[in-house]
A protein has these predicted regions:
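C-terminal accessory helical subdomains adjacent to catalytic cores in phosphodiester-
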Residues: 1-5, 18-43, 59-205
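Catalytic nucleophile-elbow at a beta strand-turn-alpha helix junction centered on a G-D-S/GDSL motif
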Residues: 9-19
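N-terminal beta-loop-helix "entrance" segment that forms/cooperates
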Residues: 43-56
């Protein structure tokens, strides 16, 4: 059980994730005296889309060093699987189960931070979103379409995509068919794009 008055820094890749955490996750946890602070990787005007391994390591290690002497302070991440760049995961294609892939990457992240900082293992709790934050939009395609009334005419196409997969997190065949690409190919008037994602992330939930 998480102790009261806990502080958790969440390193995110872009503005959409930050807005999602501030609007959806943060209020829920604060009622239990768990205080969430999202911080954008690299710099606050970073647009997201790519997470370089060295940047991840630098930012997380810096945060760990700042909090290491303080009780009830922790660091986690929220990175899209397809946002990862140059992570040392050469053998990951041999892993078929998507959740095993997630565990594989998170273990590399944890081991890297522990080797660099020698902090207590519980200080850093890595998290990778499979495959993207946009995958969660397929949890309720009717609610997604309600945000933009012109999108209702695409609801059958979106539902067919959802029905083809075990869960929204399974929606993926390749880089060109990841959730964001599927939304870009289906939704028009207005067209779905990265700016739309930032607007939708806080309100669709």
């Amino acid at each position: 059980m998480t102790p009261p008055n806990t502080h958790i820094f969440i390193v995110v890749e872009g503005q959409s994730e930050k807005e999602f955490i501030n609007t959806v996750i943060k209020p829920t946890f604060e009622s239990n005296q768990i205080y969430i602070c999202p911080t954008i990787l690299g710099r606050n005007n970073h647009k997201g889309g790519h997470v370089q391994f060295d940047r991840f390591k630098r930012d997380v290690v810096s945060l760990i060093k700042q909090i290491d002497k303080q009780n009830n302070f922790f660091v986690t991440t929220m990175f899209d699987f397809y946002g990862l760049e140059d992570f040392p995961v050469q053998d990951i294609e041999q892993v078929n189960n998507i959740y095993k892939k997630e565990e594989y990457i998170e273990k590399i992240m944890l081991d890297t931070v522990l080797q660099t900082t020698q902090c207590h293992p519980e200080r850093f709790i890595p998290y990778i979103q499979l495959y993207e934050l946009e995958g969660l939009f397929f949890s309720d395609v009717e609610k997604l379409c309600s945000i933009q009334p012109n999108w209702y005419k695409f609801i059958s196409q979106l539902q067919n995509i959802r029905n083809d997969f075990e869960t929204p997190e399974h929606i993926n065949n390749s880089f060109d068919t990841k959730p964001s690409k599927r939304l870009e190919n289906v939704l028009f008037s207005p067209k779905y794009n990265s700016k739309t994602k930032t607007l939708l992330s806080p309100i669709i939930w």
